[in-house]
Amino acid sequence: MVGSQGLGAIASHFVAGRNTGALFHLWSLGSSHVHPDESGTMSVTDQLLSNNAAYAASFNGPLPLPPAKHVAVVACMDARLNVYGALGLDEGDAHVIRNAGGVITEDEIRSLAISQRLLGTKEIILIHHTDCGMLTFTDDDFKRGIFEETGLRPAWAAEAFANEYEDVAQSIKRVTSSPFIPHTDQVRGFVFNVATGVLEEVTG
């Protein structure tokens, strides 16, 4: 059984070895909307808002609504996977849809249908990666742990998987078999290697 300790063990996989980095101080920018945590340390959100101020100062917009390269990417939310960097994309080039695992669920089908039918995308790229947290647990264990903590079972599936290559293949089939996705002749799947940065295509 997983329980609260089990869920904690699962969560620890995601944070092990994380580098915290230096904190930025919004006070130096004269911000009046800073929200320190209980220890008095600046929140990450406030640090990122500081970054946004610098970003907005040199921002060139607005860009056209349809993606310039007419492509949609579905990728894992893992922080080590920089989709724009890995594919050489710029802002405005593609729709980038991210979730835990990069799996195809009803919500990804919804987004892809809107992307193609209303915003002109034609190609779809699916990206999983090595050392994924979704390899470290099962759906049953996850639901059991949540139930033991909350007394509730989530209606949604976590979509954990035992092999990232097999799950990419399954994701391709889910996209190409959907009646809601009109363009399925250019649906390709890849596994991103978090150690080398290389994308390996999954075929068959």
Spans of model-derived segments:
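Short helix-loop-beta junction
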Residues: 88-96
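N-terminal short beta-loop-beta anion/metal-coordinating cradle
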Residues: 54-59, 63-89
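Residue-identity detector for glycine
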Residues: 3-8, 17, 21, 30, ...
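Divalent-metal-activated hydrolytic enzyme cores
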Residues: 33-35, 40-68, 101-107, 114-119, ...
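Divalent metal-coordination and catalytic microenvironments
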Residues: 52, 73, 97, 126, ...
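Ordered, amphipathic secondary-structure segments that act as subunit-interaction surfaces
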Residues: 119-129
